[in-house]
């Protein structure tokens, strides 16, 4: 590069600015520059160094560098086109290393344009700290988006956290890039950013693949080694899956499912050794992890993340997480991640005012702040922001082989007036309350996942009546594969919390969900949100004495497993945890020393077994022809009964719930098939801690027409119980 008057006042002024850590083009004054006489002048900025030399590849000294009058700057000359390295004498060590200011830009201009157009894969491939080869030289390329910054420098373990040392190259689209040779895996780093108004901010890397253990906040250079996956068979089956399959999700907060001997969270190795066999033995098909994207505050349960590309360091390394997922797949268990694209916290080291301006968020607090949560809202109208979010989703699915994303707080994304009073929100371009940019982002998210990763689930936590959440994008929908059925959860849980004597007046809370059960592809969630803030566990929310509490919860869970929709149960409910969930302590595993809790756990095991073995319980989960009411109107007795049909013609299943303590004998229910019906599950069984009242295992229909069928069954309905009967072949 021709310097064009390297000794001029302008060049000297530029060099002084760079050396002082002020804005300027570092590559214009540092590194090798061709002089008028054809020789190379090399300038190095090394504050604190005692001496520098230019050496060849074998370490032979080519030239000693002279200290400039400008603090920290050293200069030397070489013949034209001479290859060189740097020998830097620090007070405590001699370092031999390549000159980062001799490297050409590494990111293609086309990739920068793609990022600016909202391409998540391009952002994922190019930003963050990426191991690269410059020729045969191992290096790390640091790249960050900071469009309003005057200057960005990399600081870290490799340069003594000196902000003057490694200013970055400004590229188009507000991206800054610098390749540093021989940076080792595990090195901590941040970006020192000079804002438009001259402030200096120290920020973690938004695209870091690894972070320090909180409360420390630095980013970490992740390993370049590719993980050796052993789940090819699982991945092939997932991609090819087309037929309906059982979906039963165990929702887990990894830091509190179980703790180690020092009351600390288990690492991924220990979780794999303990959690996977447990989930496998209980028969769940998937584990859903509350957010494990890096987050500064454990009390947020992960729902206020800042590192959307990094598994939290609370459980070990990124490779440790990959090992956990791989082990799940070998055990036949899918892994779903709670993923938060609705908002982020305002921690100083994070995304908030990243370059001194509203970079990831809206500048107007009427659009950019969640008052309820004191968090910031992503600006979905900015392509680089949606690229950041899309790239994160792709990272978890492609790099970590995750089987699904449960997208948190979708309702807060869809509505501009969410949680706001009149006058506190900005209408969309058409004057409405819908967040059109968020809608476009969600469609892009679900569309790209569906096309690039067939078989991966996208599940919306959406609590309103927004139409078509799971409808195809081509039909105007959002394109999710599933939506949480919050209405079903609220109605049925409130019903079960009532004293049985008062339930008759609220019978519609059990039946109303079937009015809209097939309008979306629903998951029925009994999640972490139902067991916090002083409510107690699900068992503690049931009415009556201890026996009735257990009976109520057993009946409720069996009703849930028979109801159309896929299933999700938060950890602890499967054995009847009494207390609120506490994110800082283990579940109360000692309860399994008591028979009623073991009985509850056995019931959940048997419910999952029934789900896998009885196609009628899952094949028609999202089809109206998979369900038929038998008894919907017996409010006086708090009884309901329905048929689950297998659309492929398999044996139907009758589910009957009696939600009072009064047993019923000779209770007649019409069924679609004549002949034998076998009682395959009874929550009042002594195996589960019940009174052991039931139907003796097998019943024959009688030619008494009822409920639109020519034959019926004469049943015994146990107290506070749900029974399943399946037609014999």
Swiss-Prot record:
The keyword Transferase applies. The gene is glgB2. NCBIfam families: branching_enzym (TIGR01515), PRK05402.1 (NF003811), PRK12313.1 (NF008967), PRK12568.1 (NF009221). It catalyses: Transfers a segment of a (1->4)-alpha-D-glucan chain to a primary hydroxy group in a similar glucan chain. Pathway: Glycan biosynthesis; glycogen biosynthesis. Its EC number is 2.4.1.18. This is 1,4-alpha-glucan branching enzyme GlgB 2. One of its GO terms (molecular function) is hydrolase activity, hydrolyzing O-glycosyl compounds. The lineage of its organism: Bacteria, Pseudomonadati, Pseudomonadota, Gammaproteobacteria, Lysobacterales. It comes from Xanthomonas campestris pv. campestris (strain ATCC 33913 / DSM 3586 / NCPPB 528 / LMG 568 / P 25). Monomer. Keywords: Carbohydrate metabolism, Glycogen biosynthesis, Glycogen metabolism, Glycosyltransferase, Transferase. Pfam families: Alpha-amylase, Alpha-amylase_C, CBM_48, GlgB_N. Disulfide bonds: none annotated. GO terms for cellular component: cytoplasm; cytosol. One of its GO terms (biological process) is glycogen biosynthetic process.
């Amino acid at each position: 590069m021709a310097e064009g008057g390297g000794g001029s006042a302008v060049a000297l002024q530029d060099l002084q600015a760079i050396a002082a850590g002020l804005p300027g083009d570092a590559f214009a004054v540092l590194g090798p520059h061709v002089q008028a006489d054809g020789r190379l002048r090399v300038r190095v900025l090394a504050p604190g160094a005692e001496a520098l030399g230019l050496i060849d590849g074998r370490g032979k000294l080519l030239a000693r560098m002279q200290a400039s009058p400008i603090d920290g700057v050293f200069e030397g000359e070489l013949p034209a086109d001479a290859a060189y390295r740097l020998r830097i004498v620090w007070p405590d060590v001699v370092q031999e290393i390549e000159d980062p200011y001799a490297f050409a830009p590494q990111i293609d201009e086309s990739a920068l344009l793609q990022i600016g157009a909202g391409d998540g894969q391009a952002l994922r491939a190019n930003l963050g700290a990426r191991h690269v080869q410059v020729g045969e030289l191992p290096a790390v390329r640091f790249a960050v988006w900071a469009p309003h910054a005057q200057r960005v420098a990399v600081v870290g373990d490799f340069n003594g956290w000196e902000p003057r040392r490694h200013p970055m190259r400004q590229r188009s689209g507000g991206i800054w890039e610098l390749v540093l040779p021989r940076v080792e895996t595990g090195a901590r780093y941040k970006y020192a950013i000079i804002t438009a108004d001259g402030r200096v901010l120290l920020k973690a890397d938004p695209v870091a693949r690894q972070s320090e253990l909180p409360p420390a906040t630095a980013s970490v250079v992740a390993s370049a080694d590719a993980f050796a996956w052993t789940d090819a068979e699982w991945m092939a089956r997932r991609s090819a899956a087309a037929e309906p399959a059982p979906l039963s999700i165990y929702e887990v907060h990894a830091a509190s499912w179980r703790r180690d001997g020092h009351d600390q969270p288990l690492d991924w190795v220990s979780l794999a050794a303990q959690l996977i066999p447990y989930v496998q033995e209980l028969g769940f098909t998937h584990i859903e992890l509350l957010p494990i994207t890096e987050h500064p505050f454990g009390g947020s349960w992960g729902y206020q993340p800042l590192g959307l590309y990094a598994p939290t360091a609370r459980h070990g390394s990124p490779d440790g997480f990959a090992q956990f997922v791989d082990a799940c797949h070998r055990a036949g268990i899918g892994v779903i991640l709670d993923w938060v694209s609705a908002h982020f916290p305002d921690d100083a080291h994070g995304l908030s005012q990243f370059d001194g301006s509203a970079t990831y968020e809206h500048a107007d607090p009427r659009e950019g702040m969640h008052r309820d949560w004191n968090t910031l809202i992503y600006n979905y109208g900015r392509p680089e922001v949606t690229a950041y979010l899309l790239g994160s989703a792709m990272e978890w699915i492609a790099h970590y082989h995750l089987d699904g994303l449960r997208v948190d707080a979708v309702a807060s994304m869809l509505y501009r007036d969410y949680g706001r009073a009149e006058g506190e929100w900005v209408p969309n371009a058409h004057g409405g309350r819908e967040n059109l940019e968020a809608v476009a982002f969600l469609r892009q998210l679900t569309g790209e996942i569906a096309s690039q990763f067939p078989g991966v689930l996208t599940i919306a936590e959406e609590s309103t009546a927004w139409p078509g959440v799971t409808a195809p994008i081509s039909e105007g929908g959002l394109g999710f594969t599933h939506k949480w059925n919050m209405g079903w959860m609220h109605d049925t849980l409130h019903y079960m919390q009532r004293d049985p004597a008062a339930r008759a007046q609220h019978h519609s809370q059990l039946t109303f969900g079937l009015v809209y059960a097939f309008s979306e592809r629903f998951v029925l969630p009994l999640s972490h949100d139902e067991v916090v803030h002083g409510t107690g566990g699900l068992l503690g929310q049931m009415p009556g004495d201890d026996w009735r509490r257990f009976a109520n919860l057993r009946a409720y869970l069996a009703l849930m497993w028979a109801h159309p929709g896929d299933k999700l149960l938060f950890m602890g409910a499967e054995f009847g945890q009494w207390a609120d969930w506490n994110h800082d302590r283990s579940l109360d595993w000692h309860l399994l020393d008591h028979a009623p809790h073991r009985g509850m756990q056995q019931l959940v095991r048997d419910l999952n077994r029934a789900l896998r073995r009885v196609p009628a319980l899952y094949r028609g989960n999202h089809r109206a022809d998979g369900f038929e009411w038998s008894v919907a109107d017996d409010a006086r007795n708090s009884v309901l009964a329905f048929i689950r049909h297998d659309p492929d013609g398999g044996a139907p299943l009758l589910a009957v719930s009696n939600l009072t303590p009064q047993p019923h004998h000779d209770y007649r229910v019409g069924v679609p098939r004549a002949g034998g019906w076998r009682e395959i599950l009874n929550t009042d069984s002594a195996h589960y801690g019940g009174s052991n009242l039931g139907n003796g295992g097998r019943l024959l229909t009688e030619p008494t027409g009822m409920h639109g069928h020519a034959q019926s069954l004469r049943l015994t309905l146990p107290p506070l119980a749900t029974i399943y009967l399946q037609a014999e072949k």
